[in-house]
Amino acid sequence: MSPQTETKASVGFKAGVKDYKLNYYTPEYETKDTDILAAFRVTPQPGVPPEEAGASVAAESSTGTWTTVWTDGLTSLDRYKGRCYHIEPVAGEENQYIAYVAYPLDLFEEGSVTNMFTSIVGNVFGFKALRALRLEDLRIPNAYIKTFQGPPHGIQVERDKLNKYGRPLLGCTIKPKLGLSAKNYGRAVYECLRGGLDFTKDDENVNSQPFMRWRDRFLFCAEAIFKSQAETGEIKGHYLNATAGTCEEMMKRAVFARELGVPIVMHDYLTGGFTANTSLAHYCRDNGLLLHIHRAMHAVIDRQKNHGMHFRVLAKALRLSGGDHVHSGTVVGKLEGERDITLGFVDLLRDDFVEKDRSRGIYFTQDWVSLPGVLPVASGGIHVWHMPALTEIFGDDSVLQFGGGTLGHPWGNAPGAVANRVALEACVKARNEGRDLAREGNEIIREASKWSPELAAACEVWKEIKFEFPAMD
């Protein structure tokens, strides 16, 4: 045995499985302004104490490994380790706890959501000591936020670019989402924009398929944008989906969109990845393009109540990575979204400072230190009868996006767009006059339909449509 080995053995080095709570559960720790704070919903395996479960999360998502290693002595683990500093039981749930973990900022690369997530929501989610694990919220410190560009432009700059103020923006996803030729697709875009919408949108899975290659779609949509602008006198846009199989191909599509002179492109930020998304956001700021973000795949991550990650965390990550719009659910349509919880992360997208409010799912006070805001996009199973509720819930700084609620109009796409625009203008006017949209919404829509045959037809078609299913989990 070498002298060095003998020395190590003599001071108590011992192989074996670690008891994490001895080093990583530190209830006496006072968090720093520079720490990233995380709130995890922890479900330990039977027989695992909550303190050990919380400590294992802190360890496995920072400096820990399952046994003592010689190289622990070559660095300051106390400086770099994550710490579980508080644990509380979840009310009404058996064997579930909220474990609060603080991470020193040195653990994370500047300006990289990819690196932050690789640590905090990485291998620890498969740890055997835990039956389930869910990241409920993150507090991003000011020092780390300042290493990100964030959204390419933000809410105010977008309004200035579009010259549109005092109301939500209106959009429409072109349907059917797959199968149209580029020319027919462009025709649908033109009809919707001419009818009064601000934007139309590629569906998230429209990339470059055999029936419609991306370059053809971009050209026909650009023609539709410019023709509708000339006829209406309003600035129009279509979310051209630049998502591709490689970052290089994605950037090629964004460059072509800029060369065409269109105002906005789109990215599927979860399936495309945060590295690609951040690269595209930087390009969009440098080249004057707005960036619309779709959240395809989010429900795989956030729908389970005790495992995965809440969408408010994905929303915060998107604001760091960059996007001017992001889909946020509707509260009233076909996709899941509880009102208070949804409005909680909508505020985290838009506002510069958001106070802790557990009733809305906000575990930490978040200061965005003037990082530009993101417009929430309400989309999924909505129609004209939802307009008062959507206007009241989301306010002016939002995009209300009707796919089937535009293209399903019995008279065609342009009348469907007219119906939505008339309904929106009626709701905004009524709100500005002091009327209660929540209580008088249906009456406001009926009054407007008396002088808009397009709206009257839409009201008749969708008067019985609801998406109401009992929650089973």
Curated annotation (Swiss-Prot):
Signal peptide: none annotated. The keyword Ion transport does not apply. The active site is at 175 (proton acceptor), 294 (proton acceptor). The modification N6-carboxylysine is found at residue 201. Residues 1-2 form a propeptide. The record marks 334 as: Transition state stabilizer. Belongs to the RuBisCO large chain family. Type I subfamily. This is Ribulose bisphosphate carboxylase large chain. It comes from Vigna unguiculata. The gene is rbcL.
